[in-house]
Amino acid sequence: MPQLNPNPWLFIMLMSWLTFSLIIQPKLLPFTPINPPSNKTPTTTKTSPWTWPWT
């Protein structure tokens, strides 16, 4: 069963995770959101019920 042979796939998986962890992830971490979350209380809107013409 060739899919159980870890020879090429284990190396590819480890190299891809190593690439992600060491190269791509540090470049993505310095990005911060432009608008940080605030502590505003949510406002509730008053809605009026809809009257259906056939009821």
Curated annotation (Swiss-Prot):
Biological process, per Gene Ontology: proton motive force-driven ATP synthesis
Q: State one molecular function term (GO).
A: proton transmembrane transporter activity
Record Pfam families: ATP-synt_8
Task: List where in the cell it is found.
Answer: Mitochondrion membrane
Q: Which positions form S-S bridges?
A: none
Q: Does the keyword Mitochondrion apply?
A: yes
Q: How does it sit in the membrane?
A: Single-pass membrane protein
Is Transmembrane helix among the key words of this record?
yes
Q: Name one GO cellular component term.
A: proton-transporting ATP synthase complex
Domain of life, per UniProt, equals Eukaryota
Q: List the residue ranges of the region (Disordered).
A: 35-55
User: Compositional bias of type Low complexity: which residue ranges?
Assistant: 37-55
**Alphabetically ordered keywords of this record:** ATP synthesis, CF(0), Hydrogen ion transport, Ion transport, Membrane, Mitochondrion, Transmembrane, Transmembrane helix, Transport
Spell out where the chain crosses the membrane.
7-24
Q: Do you know which PANTHER family this protein is assigned to? A: ATP SYNTHASE PROTEIN 8
Q: Which protein family is it in?
A: Belongs to the ATPase protein 8 family.
Physiological role: Mitochondrial membrane ATP synthase (F(1)F(0) ATP synthase or Complex V) produces ATP from ADP in the presence of a proton gradient across the membrane which is generated by electron transport complexes of the respiratory chain. F-type ATPases consist of two structural domains, F(1) - containing the extramembraneous catalytic core and F(0) - containing the membrane proton channel, linked together by a central stalk and a peripheral stalk. During catalysis, ATP synthesis in the catalytic domain of F(1) is coupled via a rotary mechanism of the central stalk subunits to proton translocation.
Q: Subunit structure of this entry?
A: F-type ATPases have 2 components, CF(1) - the catalytic core - and CF(0) - the membrane proton channel.
Name of the protein in question: ATP synthase protein 8
